[in-house]
Amino acid sequence: MHAPNRRQILSLLSSVSIGAAVLRPERLFAQVTSLQDIAASSFPTPRATVFVAKEIITMDPGRPRAEAVAVIGGRIAALGTLAEVQALAGDQPYDIDETFRDKVIMAGFVEQHVHPVLSSLTMSSEVISIEPWDSISGFSDQVRDEVTYQERLKAALAAHTDKATTFLSWGYHHYFHGPLDRTILDQLAPDFPVVIWHRSCHEMFLNSLALRQFGVDEAFMATFTPSEAGQSSLAGGHFFEQGLLRLLERLGSLASPARMKGGLEFTVDFYHRSGITTCCEPGGFVDKSLQDAINAVYSGDQIPFNHYFIGDGSRFATAHPADPAAMLAMAESVLGWGSGRTRYLPQQVKLFTDGAIFSQLMQMKDGYTDGHDGEWLMDPARFGYAFQNFWDNDYHIHIHNNGDLGMDVLLDNLEQAMRRKPRFDHRMTIVHFGFASTEQVNRAASLGAIVSANPYYVTALAGRYEDVGIGPERSARMVPLADVKAAGMRMSFHSDMPMAPAKPMQLVWSAVTRTTAEGDVSGPDQRIDLDTALKAITIDAAHSIRLENEVGSVTPGKLANFTILEQSPYDVAPEDLAALQIWGTVLEGRVQPVLTPITRTELRPSPMPLGMAPLRRFAETHEGHDHTDSCAAVRYALSAAVARNLA
C-alpha cells in the first residue's frame, strides 16, 4: 500500500487544515489531534503566531477560504477558523496577531519574470512613456500622441538646469510619439547633452553634444562591424539593436554608482508596494562578479521578497556551440552564485526564438502591414541545438516567444523532443506569448507546454497595433488567454519589468478586462475569469518555476508568504482590480507594511554596499562578447558599460 501524499492526508482532515509532513502514515488518525502533538519532541515547543483576518484567500482548492492561519518558524502550521486553530494548538503557546483583522490575507504574489538592472536604470531616468509609471521622481502619466510627447519632453528639458550633466529620458516610442533624430534634439536642447532611450530598450537617440561628450564620432564608427554600422546612424544620432550595443560601450557614465544603487533600491520598494513576495529573473547573469554586485542589494535578510534567477541558456549555447557537455557544465556552474535571499533555480534555463513585441520584431507568419521584417534572437538552428541538448538532460526550458512563426519553431522542437525522448511534467514554458493561433495553442497543450504570458501587451499595444503593423484582426488575438484556458493549459503572468510595471493586480486586470489604453476592449472573447487570473499570479506562477511546494498558496507546510489586501478582489468590479490597495506583505512570518513611496530626494541608504569591484572585474572579462538576445543583450552591455565607468 502506498503512503498517502500531502494532498491525500489533508483531504482526510475534513474541515481543518494542518501540516502533515511529520506524520507517520500508519498512525495518521491517532496522531492528528493538535499542534502540540505534531510538534511534540524532546526539543522545546516553539511559540506560534496566529494571524486573524477578515478573510484568507488561500488559492488552495482543498480549503479556498479561512479565517486564521498559524505560523511556526516561518512556515504555515495550521489553517481554519480561529476556533479550529486554537483547538489544534492545545497547550502549545501561541500569540494571536490581529493586525489583519479587517483586511484580506491572500497567498503571496509571485512575479516570475522581471529585469532589475534595466528597471533600475529606466526608472531613474526622466520617464515619458506610452503608459503611466511610478518612477523614482514620482508619478509619470501616459503619453500616447506626438503633440503631448513633444510638450512633455520640452518641459522636462527646460527643467534640466544642470547643463553639465546629461539629460536621460526613457519611454519614447516612434509608433506613438512621431519621428525623432539628432536634428530634432539639437533644436530642442542645443546647450546640453541629451539621450532618449526607446520604450523597447533597444534603441537610443542622441543630440550632437551627447555624441561629442561620449566620443561617438567617425573614428569610433569605423570600428563597427557591417551589421553594427547597418543599425546605426551617426548623422541621425540613432543607434538600435547591434548598433546600440556598441554605443553602450561609451555610455557608462550614464549608469553612475548613485543611479544604479538608487535604482536597485527603488525596485525593492516597487516590488514590495505591489505585494510581491517571490520574484525571478529568467536569463540571469553569466558572470559571478556581476551577480555578486546585484546580490549586494538584493540578498540581505531585510529585503521583503526572495529573488530567484534562471540561467541564460542562449549564452551557454553561444559560448559552446559545438560542445554540449561544456554547455551543460556552464549551466551548472552558476547554481551556487546566489546569496541570502537571491538564488539560482536548478535544472532550468531560458532560450529565445524571435524579437520583441514592443519593437514589432516578432516573427509573424503573415508579416507586417507596412512590409518590415521580424528578427530571430536565436536563429532556428542554434535554438534547436540548445533546446534538444537541454531537453535530453531533463531541463525545464523557458522560451521567449512572441510571434506565431516563432511559435511554430518552438513547437516543432518540442514535438521532435517528445518523439525522441518523451518526458512528462516537463513544463516547457512559452514566455510572453504575444501571438498564437487556436491550433497552435491546442498543439502546445497536447505536447504538455505551459504559458507564462504578459497580458499587459493588450493594454499597452493592442489599440495602436490595430493601425500600425499588425491590423485589427490579429491585434484582437494578442495574448489569447481564453484559448489557453479552453485547452486546459496552466498559465501564469509576468510583467517583464520594465516592459510592464511589476504590479500583479494590474496584470490580473489586463487579463480579465482586456481594456486598452484607449479605453476600448480588444478581443473580448479572449478575456478570462478572475479565479484563473489570480492563480496566474500565485499558485500557477509558482508552478511555472517549480516552486509550488514552497509558495503560491496558503497551505500547511509552505512558507508563510502572504499579500495583505485592503479588500478582496472578489468584492470589487473588474474595472477596479488594478487599483486594489495593498497594505503590505508577510514574508516567512515577518509582517512587512508598505512604506511611503520613495522619491528621488528620499532614497534610503542601502543596508549593504553595492559591489563595485565585482563590476570592474565583469568589465575586464566581457569585452566584445556576442550580443544577440534582446533584453538580455542590453542588460549585459549596460552592465559592462557601468563597470568600465567604475574602473
Region locations from a protein language model:
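N-terminal export signals
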Residues: 2, 8-30
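Divalent metal-binding segments
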Residues: 12, 35-52, 57, 61-327, ...
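A generic secondary-structure signal for well-formed alpha-helical elements
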Residues: 17, 116, 160, 192, ...
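Flexible loop residues that form catalytic
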Residues: 115, 172, 284, 433-434, ...
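Acidic (Asp/Glu)-rich catalytic clusters
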Residues: 298, 336-340, 445-446
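Structural recognition of alpha->loop->beta junctions
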Residues: 333-334, 338-345, 419-429
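His/Asp/Glu-enriched, well-ordered alpha-helical/loop segment
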Residues: 388-398, 402-428, 432-433, 438, ...
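C-terminal functional module detector
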Residues: 541, 550, 564-574, 583-586, ...
